A protein has these predicted regions:
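Catalytic nucleophile-His microenvironment captured as a short glycine-rich beta-strand/loop
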Residues: 70, 149, 356-389
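Active-site nucleophile-adjacent alpha helix/oxyanion-hole segment immediately C-terminal to the catalytic cysteine
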Residues: 47-315, 392-395, 402, 410
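N-terminal regions that are enriched for targeting/export leaders
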Residues: 2-59
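Long, positively charged binding patches that form subdomain-scale interaction surfaces
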Residues: 288-363
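Short His-Asn-centered micro-motif
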Residues: 73, 317-320, 369
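Generic recognition of flexible, low-complexity loop/linker segments
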Residues: 291, 301-307, 353-358, 367-374, ...
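Active/binding-pocket-proximal capping segment
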Residues: 321-326, 331-349, 372-375, 382-392, ...
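Conserved catalytic-core surface of thiol
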Residues: 374-447
Length: 447
């Protein structure tokens, strides 16, 4: 039997609030300054110093602006590092908008194929409702980025610059979403009328042609060939004509993407360590590789990330960026705010419980560009390259404490040479398929 809130209970709550002087002080501070600003702990800001024993050089900070392309920016920032080193460049940027174009087209096909795969599922059931929720969101995963590059290559930003729709994707995404939901409705109606799969796929091809046209209008036509011109650090001018996106990747980037694997830390009962996982209905390029993770203890993620940076290579990662972080200072620290003291309450959930109860998930991808190791070789803070421009943090860089890493870091991508033979075998084993709405797939459904 349910129980309502009574007047007597409210009177008791009010008396308890009024009896504590600290409640009045907290109320005045929060109502005038806001909850999070009132809780900033000065000592945490003073202790978190942006200096690191291992610090990699990097180009100018990028800015994803009003879009959910963090995963793409982070991945391309790790790849541009190779170009800058190889060709002695002060800075360089690969076109995020170019891969954004193809990602939207591929996601549209992936969505429509998923609709064809679920024609007999109820439209208001959990699965189809989930698919319809965000057909072409901006988010993604490392493996999805690799699929795009292997199929379409990459281009420098000068060959395909940003557009209004790539820097602020909301209007385009809303239009694409409406069109794809309409397409899903049409395909399901045709199925109910008894039309066969071949006829439905004919309709799907027409639908994709319309999506392609919309993308060209919003983002511009992607280049088939282009000229690459640049100056090195010594101001020497270079030009190469007739490049294609794939030949540019092969010559100027030259990274074997198959060497890299995703490690996650998901300490929940349903995901034993030492096993590989995938997420159902998560992807973009239909014929590409499935998203795959190896679940390991958090110390293994740290060990692999540090080893890769010691070899001079940055590390792509996924985390829950909004928890215990302060945008202006760029500090990610469990002690950055004293909310428990301010509110006289306690937050006691473990990392596993936060995942199980919807309190935390992967929300943002960035790049590790350094780490500070203490006298025992243990990390105590990590240097983070963000993609929110130069204003937040220290010239666009964030600082992550090692304790924050423990609680809100979920994924790193590293070269498999930093794994043991046993770990590689576990990664390559048949993955366990997680539900589409599992928190380990959340980075790819950023909306």
């Amino acid at each position: 039997m349910s129980q309502e809130i009574t007047k007597e209970q409210i009177a008791a709550f009010d008396a308890d609030f009024s009896a504590q002087r600290a409640n009045r002080v907290a109320m005045n501070a929060v109502t005038n300054n806001g909850l999070l600003a009132s809780a900033i702990r000065r000592e945490a800001v003073e202790q978190d110093v942006h200096e690191y024993s291992i610090s990699l050089e990097q180009g100018e900070i990028c800015n994803q602006k009003q879009s959910g392309r963090c995963w793409m920016f982070a991945a391309l920032n790790t790849l541009r590092y190779q170009v800058m080193k190889k060709y002695d460049l002060k800075t360089f940027e690969l076109s995020q908008a170019y891969l954004f174009f193809w990602d939207k087209l591929e996601k549209s096909n992936y969505f429509l194929e998923s609709i064809l795969d679920t024609l007999d599922e109820p439209a208001n059931g959990r699965l189809v409702s989930y698919l319809l929720m965000a057909p072409v969101n901006d988010g993604g995963q490392w493996d999805m980025l690799c699929n795009l590059i292997e199929k379409y290559g990459v281009v420098p930003k000068t060959a395909y610059p940003e557009s209004k729709a790539s820097s602020g994707s909301r209007e385009m995404d809303m239009t694409l979403t409406e069109k794809l939901r309409e397409d899903a409705c049409i395909l399901r109606k045709l199925h109910k009328e008894g039309k066969g799969l071949d006829e439905l796929r004919t309709h799907k091809t027409r639908m994709l042609g319309e999506i392609y046209r919309l993308l060209c209008i919003c983002l511009g036509e992607p280049p088939k060939t282009f000229t690459f011109e640049y100056r090195d650090k010594d101001n020497n001018f270079h030009r190469e004509e007739g490049l294609t996106p794939k030949s540019f990747f092969e010559k100027y980037v030259g990274v074997d993407l198959s060497d890299y694997v995703s490690l996650i830390n998901a300490p929940t009962e349903d995901k034993p360590y030492g096993r590989s996982y995938t997420v159902q209905y998560l992807g973009n390029v239909k014929e590409g590789s499935a998203v795959r993770y190896l679940n390991l203890p958090i110390e293994e993620l740290k060990k692999a990330a540090i080893a890769q940076m010691k070899d001079g290579q940055p590390v792509w990662f996924g985390c829950d960026v909004g928890k215990h972080s302060e945008r202006d200072s760029g500090i990610m620290d469990l002690d950055i705010r004293g909310l428990e003291d301010l509110l006289d309450t306690r937050f006691t959930m473990t990392k596993a419980e936060r995942l199980d109860y919807g309190q935390s998930l992967m929300t943002h991808a960035m790049v590790f560009q350094g780490v500070n190791l203490d006298e025992n070789g243990k990390p105590n803070r990590w240097r983070v390259e963000n993609s929110w421009g130069k204003e937040p943090g220290k010239d666009g860089y964030y600082l992550m404490t090692d304790r924050w890493f423990d609680e809100y870091m979920y994924q790193v991508v590293v070269n498999k040479k930093y794994l043991t033979a046993e770990q590689i075998a576990a990664y390559e084993a048949e993955p366990i398929a997680l539900e589409p709405w599992d928190p380990m797939g959340s980075l790819a459904v950023v909306r």
